Amino acid sequence: MKDELFKQSPKKQFEFDKSVASVFDDMINRSVPFYRENLELCGNLLAKILPINASICDLGCSSANFLIFLANLRKDFKLFGVDNSASMVEVAKSKAKAYGLDISFFETNLCEFDFFVCDVFVANYTMQFIRPPKRQELLDKIYKNLNSKGILIMSEKILYEDAFLSKNIIELYADYKEKQGYSKFEIAAKREALENVLIPYSQKENLNMLEKAGFKKIESIFKWANFETFIAFKD
């Protein structure tokens, strides 16, 4: 379905409810620059470097796009998805079933999730929705539950510290969304709905959190304007 949720002024803050879940795939493909290309980059990298039967847990898996891509790359992967939205988990399960894929899903708040040890944790555009006081604690749990040589892939919308640059990058991003078919009204309405829901950090703040959690080797593997993907290794 096409995302037309913000053709009218929002009546509430943004949340991943049934209305969002029903149009999520269209929304994210039109709202996150190079979403598919970045997903494929991360998936192909993991398929290339991970051992047989590696376990991968997608934290904030939404509609399971990344997990489905991984499942089709390598049949030996053990795949898990976690999301706090019942509607999103329902969509994810439905898609996985339609493709005949064995993926386990958990519907729970990430801050309350009973973590288990994995080779990889993925947090694509997830941390930005976690309340700031809880982010470090969550990253600490991720690090603790990674196997030796474990990997975290984390994608985030980021802030620029320079006000002039930040203003112009934000305007370029708005231009991008217009080119994807969103009107100026829709862009403004969604921005209003996301106020105090999506809270981005700067690149430096994200790197500091990862380092504080214990990660020693951290690299940026993708960036477009105010979107960036980090890969962090436990050892």
UniProtKB/Swiss-Prot annotation:
This is Carboxy-S-adenosyl-L-methionine synthase. HAMAP family: Cx_SAM_synthase (MF_01589). It comes from the Bacteria. GO terms for molecular function: carboxyl- or carbamoyltransferase activity; S-adenosyl-L-methionine binding. Belongs to the class I-like SAM-binding methyltransferase superfamily. Cx-SAM synthase family. One of its GO terms (biological process) is tRNA wobble uridine modification. Homodimer. Its EC number is 2.1.3.-. InterPro entries: CmoA, Methyltransf_25, SAM-dependent_MTases_sf. Coiled coil: none annotated. It comes from Campylobacter jejuni subsp. jejuni serotype O:6 (strain 81116 / NCTC 11828). Keywords: S-adenosyl-L-methionine, Transferase.
